[in-house]
């Protein structure tokens, strides 16, 4: 089994999403012999945002691409191939200003590729990546799950993953992390129980 582990927090070792996503992946390793893990840190090694250069790279014949266009194509292909190869994707997704980090959005823009993760038909879009399981490690300073303020965070991720055809989506959630030390401790403990319960039921 191949697992793709994505982190997107800018907080380094102080990040709850990084801590919990690492614990989730470690638990998976302990319960899945031969697990092949690919790790991508979108804060430390950011994927360039979708731009005019991206469009130019895709529309320019390979033999006519300069160094910048070749690099743009290589980055997009590498990110997409990692995603397509994975059986499981673990996404560390902290909330910043009511949505996901710009680094995570840049990654999503690179895997949203017509003919690879979705296609359009006369009856509408069809997802092409539905054979995956995705676990979103969702963290937030406030409490937003199930509310309008969370629509551009967990809601957005569910929407775009669903657009890719993915229906097996789970959320490990720790929110209210900015409400004080005790609420933070309780929220992280609850997320850890979710992680433990996921494998206890397996």
From Swiss-Prot:
Residues engaged in binding FMN: 9, 15-17, 95-98, 139-142
Keyword terms of this UniProt record: Flavoprotein, FMN, NAD, Oxidoreductase
Organismal lineage: Bacteria, Pseudomonadati, Pseudomonadota, Gammaproteobacteria, Pseudomonadales
EC number: 1.6.5.-, 1.7.1.17
Keyword Membrane set for record: no
Free-text cofactor note: Binds 1 FMN per subunit.
Known catalytic reactions: 2 a quinone + NADH + H(+) = 2 a 1,4-benzosemiquinone + NAD(+); N,N-dimethyl-1,4-phenylenediamine + anthranilate + 2 NAD(+) = 2-(4-dimethylaminophenyl)diazenylbenzoate + 2 NADH + 2 H(+)
Oligomer and partners: Homodimer.
InterPro entries, sorted: Flavodoxin_fold, Flavoprotein-like_sf, FMN-dep_NADH:Q_OxRdtase_AzoR1, NADH:quinone_OxRdtase_FMN_depd
GO function terms (MF aspect): electron transfer activity; FMN binding; oxidoreductase activity, acting on NAD(P)H as acceptor; oxidoreductase activity, acting on NAD(P)H, quinone or similar compound as acceptor
Record function comment: Quinone reductase that provides resistance to thiol-specific stress caused by electrophilic quinones. Reduces both benzoquinones and naphthoquinones efficiently.
Protein name: FMN-dependent NADH:quinone oxidoreductase 2
Broad enzyme group: oxidoreductase
Organism: Pseudomonas aeruginosa (strain ATCC 15692 / DSM 22644 / CIP 104116 / JCM 14847 / LMG 12228 / 1C / PRS 101 / PAO1)
Cofactor: FMN
Keyword Ribosomal protein listed: no
Gene that this polypeptide is encoded by: azoR2
Other known facts: Rate of quinone reduction is higher than reduction of azo substrates, suggesting the enzyme is better suited for carrying out quinone rather than azo reduction.
Family membership noted in the UniProt record: Belongs to the azoreductase type 1 family.
């Amino acid at each position: 089994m191949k697992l793709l582990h994505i982190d997107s927090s800018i907080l380094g070792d102080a990040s709850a999403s990084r801590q919990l996503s690492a614990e989730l992946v470690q638990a998976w390793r302990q319960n899945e012999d031969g697990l092949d893990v690919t790790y991508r840190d979108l804060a430390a090694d950011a994927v360039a945002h979708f731009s005019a250069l991206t469009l130019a790279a895709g529309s320019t014949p390979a033999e006519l691409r300069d160094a910048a266009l070749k690099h743009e194509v290589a980055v997009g292909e590498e990110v997409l191939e990692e995603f397509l190869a994975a059986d499981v994707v673990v996404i560390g997704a902290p909330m910043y200003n009511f949505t996901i980090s710009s680094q995570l959005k840049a990654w999503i823009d690179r895997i949203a590729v017509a003919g690879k993760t979705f296609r359009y038909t006369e009856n509408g879009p069809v997802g092409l990546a539905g054979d995956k399981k995705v676990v979103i490690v969702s963290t937030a300073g406030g409490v937003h799950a199930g509310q309008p303020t969370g629509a551009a965070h967990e809601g957005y991720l569910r929407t775009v993953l669903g657009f890719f055809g993915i229906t097996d989506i789970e959320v490990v959630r720790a929110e209210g992390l900015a409400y004080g030390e005790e609420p933070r401790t309780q929220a992280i403990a609850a997320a850890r129980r979710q992680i433990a319960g996921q494998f206890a039921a397996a």
